[in-house]
Amino acid sequence: MSRQQNPLIQVKDLKKYYPVKTGIIPHVTDYVKAVDGVSFSIYEGEILGLVGESGCGKTTIGKLLTGLEKPTEGAILYRGMDILDWTAKEQKKYRTKIQMIFQDPYSSLNPRKHIYEILAAPMLYHGISDKQTVQKDVKELLEMVGMPQSALGRYPHEFSGGQRQRIGIARALSLKPEFIVCDEPVLS
């Protein structure tokens, strides 16, 4: 595979430290270094796997890449621009370009929403679909992940772990992202 000039995603000296608070009047006594000085680049069409023991920071890196967490230090560049310097409007647009398939599909799906609502809402909110096309688009997503259309009116608790994971995958694909972070997507 020939690499382009610029990476799609570039991570430079990324750090995420969580404070440890102790005492009756809690004060910071130390930090847990969940991510400490990580750097890598990912080019279009490339797949990168992070391998490591439990608790080594793989999920935290995914959350940092998607903007769900803010780093303590470092830079995350998307097409050469640091996402940490962006306005809220620019970050909203970025979140349509990068999606995450979560390790636990049950906790990532709203238990009060039907599957149709879970899949349709992001497409409508971000302008991927409109009211005329959203139903067709949702059905296509279900077909892509091997789920029957009868799933649309059901709630997440009515599915097996594997089926919920496929719904989570469909939701990640719903925004037609350029980049997907998969946090142990075949665990369930």
Positions of predicted regions on the chain:
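The feature captures the beta-strand-to-loop junction immediately N-terminal to the Walker
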Residues: 51-52
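Helix-to-loop junction immediately C-terminal to a conserved catalytic motif
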Residues: 66
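Conserved ABC transporter NBD signature motif
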Residues: 74-82
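Conserved ABC ATPase "signature" region
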Residues: 133-150
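Conserved ABC ATPase signature
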Residues: 155-159, 163
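Hydrophobic anchor residue at the start of the ABC signature
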Residues: 169
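Conserved catalytic motifs of ABC-family nucleotide-binding domains
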Residues: 176
